[in-house]
Amino acid sequence: MDLKSLVRDIPDFPKPGILFRDITTLLRDPEGLRYTIDFLTQKCKEAEIKPDYVIGIESRGFIFGSPLAYQLGAGFIPIRKRGKLPAAVHSIEYDLEYGTDCLEVHQDALRHSSRVLIVDDLIATGGTASATAKLVQKIGCELVGFGFIIELRDLEGRKYLPDVPIISLIEY
């Protein structure tokens, strides 16, 4: 299946000069969504990625991370932006182009030495994925891989990630 054909391009969003890759058209296609999850599962198995937990980065990482966790027999844990989780959290601040942001996970969500796979819909500059990796490693988890639906290769985000398997299904 040609997944790229299911992604809609929206020029000048969210600002002029940006070409936004919109996955809502992929998500609404039942066969495309099923194929995406099955293909990501297959790629993880081929790379021998066997996580205890799949970490989904807010918010579109939740969409793909939950069914992937189910397929891999793993638990699912959301990584949220600051202030979205009700219990005590581990957190990490990271730099954005114009400022900083913060990611959080419940303190009781991950056990030391847990094997984790980080999933998101897209990798661009790698900032959010890199911060997520640092957060789970700070907790004492073993990072076993990354899974992305889309990778924007020109932005070279993967060079900022740890040396573990990195799966991307669609490349631009």
Swiss-Prot record:
GO molecular function list: adenine binding; adenine phosphoribosyltransferase activity; AMP binding
Q: Which UniProt keywords apply?
A: Cytoplasm, Glycosyltransferase, Purine salvage, Transferase
- The chain's disulfide connectivity reads none
This entry's Enzyme Commission designation comes to 2.4.2.7
Q: Which cellular component terms (GO) are annotated to the entry?
A: cytoplasm
Q: Where in the cell is it found?
A: Cytoplasm
Instruction: Note whether Magnesium occurs among the keywords.
Output: no
Pathway membership: Purine metabolism; AMP biosynthesis via salvage pathway; AMP from adenine: step 1/1
Similarity remark: Belongs to the purine/pyrimidine phosphoribosyltransferase family.
Q: What does this protein do?
A: Catalyzes a salvage reaction resulting in the formation of AMP, that is energically less costly than de novo synthesis.
- Which HAMAP family does the entry mention? Aden_phosphoribosyltr
Q: What is this protein's name?
A: Adenine phosphoribosyltransferase
Q: Which organism is it from?
A: Nostoc punctiforme (strain ATCC 29133 / PCC 73102)
Q: What is the lineage of its organism?
A: Bacteria, Bacillati, Cyanobacteriota, Cyanophyceae, Nostocales
